[in-house]
Amino acid sequence: MKFQALSPWGFAVIAIYLAGLALISIVSRRRAFIANDYLNATHSLPTWAAALSFLAYNCGSIEIIGMSAMASQYGVQALHFYWIGGIPGMVFFALVVLPLYIRSGARSLPEYLDRRFGPRVRLLNACISMVGTASLAGAALYAIAHVLHVVLGCNLLLGALASAMVVLAYVLLGGIRATIYTSIFQFFVVIAGLFPLLMATFPFRLTTFAQRPETWHLWQPLLLFAPHASLDRLGVVAGLGFVISFSYWCTDFVVVQRALTARGVEEARKVPILAGFGKLAIAFLIVLPGAAAPMLLHGAHAASHDETMPALLSLVYGPTLLGLGVAALLSGLMAGFAGNAAGFAAAWTQEIYRVRIRPDRPEQHYIRMGRWAVVMCFLLAGLAAYLAAQFRDLMEFLQLVLSLFYAPLLAAVLAGMFRKQARERDALAGILLGVMTGITLEACVRLGAIRFGSQMNANFYIAILSFSVSMLVASRVDSRTRQGSAAMVELPLEPMTVSSLRPTFTTGVLSVLLLAACLALNLVWW
């Protein structure tokens, strides 16, 4: 077998895809009258649109490139990132965290933290959100460059610049609405482009199962506690399944932003739950072809595991179908790239610039500032793409970002929700000490002072430790707090009670079905 080149019809498919992006962006532009329309679109979308955009954002660079690379190394154990690393966190976000965000009247996570703790925590969270969104945008940019390099032979830098210009154009044109509706369009392009690959690689999956059966089990090959192994059960359950998963779903700026676009509390609750069912199925679409890659490619593709998916498409698809496959990869990657760029702009403009630098300015002023922030995000994404290139594969970089910056933030959020005595000073100290703990541990790993079996396993334990330190500090209660000191923030938020969190019958049934399906799949693939 040999790699295919794109035919004129293949290029035509890509051109049609780009034309669709332009059309959606132009239509979306007509609806952006105020800064919230352009940057957040809070409580303005139907449930189906919010759920599809929520799923499409998550099925971008992380899944398509990163998960196929993980599958080529670890086999179906990459499904952990979808199932235990996705579903419990999504249900917790829907049933517990999201209602509190909405009932507080906040339009974003930083605004909620301002109401719960104070303005300094809001500022710190906004800064962390900007670092996180720029890093994830850079990872998507790096992945797009790899796709164009493998399929078209483009120079990595040239491919990154070309794709960045396309995304920059439609984000600047239509803002968050354009990002949401183009991501829905891109989601269906991803399904259409990758489904034939799932079918075509079936015989090779059978061969791989016969020769490497250990790569087709989720839990059986893993030891309970083995930091020197590639993965272990403690790291997967506590590090990935709890800390990283819950921190991503509950504190990622873009994830929260997409959920809050739904029009009401129950509509917003359905967004991550409905997306969870899609996530269960999409896992097979990406992981199973990646698991067959070692047998199919026979070492024919580049040394980087991140080139697994584009190499598979170039090998399996014909010249015309390859155009649809490339459009699918670009769709998922651009959706993640654009979503994080829009999130960066909202974090800077709405949470920092509007609140602390230039309040009470005309709405058009904030829209212009949001556009400049998008440009700044693209510049920072270039730096993040360079950092991502220093890791063995994309997923190692992404999980490290979540472990360092999102895990401590989750601890502060949970402390604020479950402990009425949690104060702004302790939340600030907890977040900062958690980040410093994670950075210190990663430095020790890099210097060889602490050894793990893989960078991924190190990421899981970094997440556990940084979260634990942050939680201990953020939730501490001293004698002044017990006596009701005035240093404690007056909470404008209602206390969290079981009755205030009780979902509707439909939402509750959907949540139970989603968790049951996740458990059943784990048992089947044990």
Predicted regions and their residues:
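Membrane-embedded helix-loop-helix hairpins and adjacent transmembrane boundary segments
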Residues: 1-526
